[in-house]
């Protein structure tokens, strides 16, 4: 796993690197396409896909540039299929601090069912955890002991639920069902901020231990 932080609100773009010829899945290319391309070239990576945890503007800003340069498919939860096309839905038209709206073509592949999935050599499990956004999806790599969780959960916090389509109760229910039940040593890679573990969040995250509702 390799990551760079991009954009004004410091979004984490992840590069999941395989064993076969540096095949790489890019998760959430949020901004600064030139920096993402530089990371790919400097590390001799071979992109094979872009995967979105969700389609808020800060996670999709470099999507179209990267897709076109490397001619690779974009994978997405179909609940948010219109969000790449609509700056009102992805939030870029509603945020006065975003100078340009974020637009992209429709995704190439939609995750029609949650559960086990494969892209090339990569095997993982998907779970739908709405609440921050309607289509938020986490990607669990059980064999490798980590999960890419987007803006569902952070170190010491959880995703915003005051955005359109958000629900704090639904978000916490999903985290309790799909995140808290993972092995404690599972590393969580969030959309913003530092990695954490399931165990650390169970014991210290105020949104999970009842201190904050």
Name what the model sees in each region.
Residues 14, 109, 114-115, 137, ...:
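Residue-level detector of beta-strand structural context in well-folded domains
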Residues 1-43, 138-150:
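Conserved beta-strand hairpin/beta-sheet module of binuclear metal-dependent hydrolase folds
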Residues 16, 53, 129:
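Conserved S/T- and glycine-rich ATP-binding loop of Class I adenylate-forming
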Residues 9-10, 32, 56, 80, ...:
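A generic "binding-loop/recognition-motif" signal
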Residues 32-116, 122, 203-211:
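Active-site HxH/HxHxD metal-binding segment of metal-dependent hydrolases
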Residues 90-93, 122-213:
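Metallo-beta-lactamase
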